[in-house]
């Protein structure tokens, strides 16, 4: 099951990496040799045991992808930010990932209120949110702009 999920993740990354990019313009977080992913999760708060393992799992899978040659010769890099399961910290973390780190996509971010709080910012930057760790309908229903 895990391999299936990561295969889907890899497929989405490959699709998003090249859709809408021309020779003169590249997507945020995509360079000739790297694709930057971001996640905000609970690393030191009340559900840190879950957050820490999600970061470690993502890092392990990304290492496997990079060891196999990356995606079209590009290595993946993931930046994980700790929101301590607090909405204001999640907003700060997402703003850093979007504006300073210039991530290509958000992946496996933990928490319904945290994901809901940053959806608008991500939409403004055209940064997809793949596999949010939440079961809320707002994570699966289409976003109406």
Annotate each predicted stretch with a short phrase:
Residues 30, 47, 71, 137-140:
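Short clusters of hydrophobic/aromatic residues that line enzyme substrate/ligand-binding pockets
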Residues 59-71:
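Flexible, small-residue-rich helix->loop connector segments that border functional cores
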Residues 1-36, 67:
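Short, low-complexity disordered leader/linker segments with a strong preference
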Residues 79-80, 84-104:
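Short, well-structured alpha-helical segments in soluble
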Residues 71-84, 143-145:
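Short beta-strand elements in bilobed, periplasmic/extracellular small-molecule ligand-binding domains
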Residues 102-145:
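Extracytoplasmic ligand/sensor domains, especially the bilobed periplasmic-binding protein
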Residues 30-31, 35-59, 81-87, 110-111:
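Extracytoplasmic "Venus flytrap"
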Residues 34-36, 77, 126:
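Residues that mark the start of a beta-strand
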